[in-house]
UniProtKB/Swiss-Prot annotation:
Keywords: Disulfide bond, Hydrolase, Metal-binding, Metalloprotease, Periplasm, Protease, Signal, Zinc
UniProt cross-references to InterPro entries, sorted A to Z: Hedgehog_sig/DD-Pept_Zn-bd_sf, Peptidase_M74
Disordered: annotated segments: 225-274
Binding site for Zn(2+) 2: 147, 150
Gene name for this UniProt entry: mepA
Species this chain originates from: Citrobacter koseri (strain ATCC BAA-895 / CDC 4225-83 / SGSC4696)
Name of the protein this chain belongs to: Penicillin-insensitive murein endopeptidase
Cysteines paired by S-S bonds: 44-265, 187-235, 216-223
Amino acid sequence: MKKTALALLALLVSSASLAATPWQKITHPVPGSAQSIGGFSNGCIVGADTLPVQSEHYQVMRTDQRRYFGHPDLVMFIQRLSTQVSNLGFGTVLIGDMGMPAGGRFNGGHASHQTGLDVDIFLQLPKTRWTQAQLLRPQAIDLVSRDGKHVVPSLWKPEISSLIKLAAEDNDVTRIFVNPAIKQQLCLDAGTDRDWLRKVRPWFQHRAHMHVRLRCPADSLECEDQPLPPPGDGCGAELQSWFEPPEPGTTKPEKKTPPPLPPSCQALLDEHVL
């Protein structure tokens, strides 16, 4: 009985944590000129574009989740990158989550992806296009060793390094988040051409995909950009600190209460949902 009660409690907690946010009730982009509003982890978007799900250069995964919306700059970046990759003969780019029709907070899985300027891209480039069944239930390839200290040599391919480099060299890209072990391998692969590495930032998880973030568009006056990454290639002490064990007594930070929405985002919710 106790086990059953605990199981039911866990299910209720899980269900509550995955309850739909108000943003998920907005099923179509909000009309208007494209405006990314607020910060990447606390914002929204007006006038989002829909990424076409049919393309000869890329494929969109989990279309049933309807997370293929973003600022026109993001849509153009995806089209630009995937065309470059295709022209080089690397394979098909696999597109994961972008944002919801009006951006905003997800019910789980992402803290950012709220202003239409973020996209997840799988770090695999299949030569054969995936079936619809594969796209709906994609199988990620974990490129990082079990101990988290390096990539798996048999899984790492030069095309993956080139994919990340191509994305980082795009003028609209401000950051790319990957696992520290992947960043470490990129540092080893880069040779003397290293300027692009500054944009590639180590982050938790991200073992099978890269998270690409664009800068705020010039005409999105309420968009909040992050500071630029520190100068340099980021391959030194900062990167190595990710592989050091936590200091004794270190505890996980408590989950923070989400900050208030930017006024324009709250007004958008008030008009379209609440």
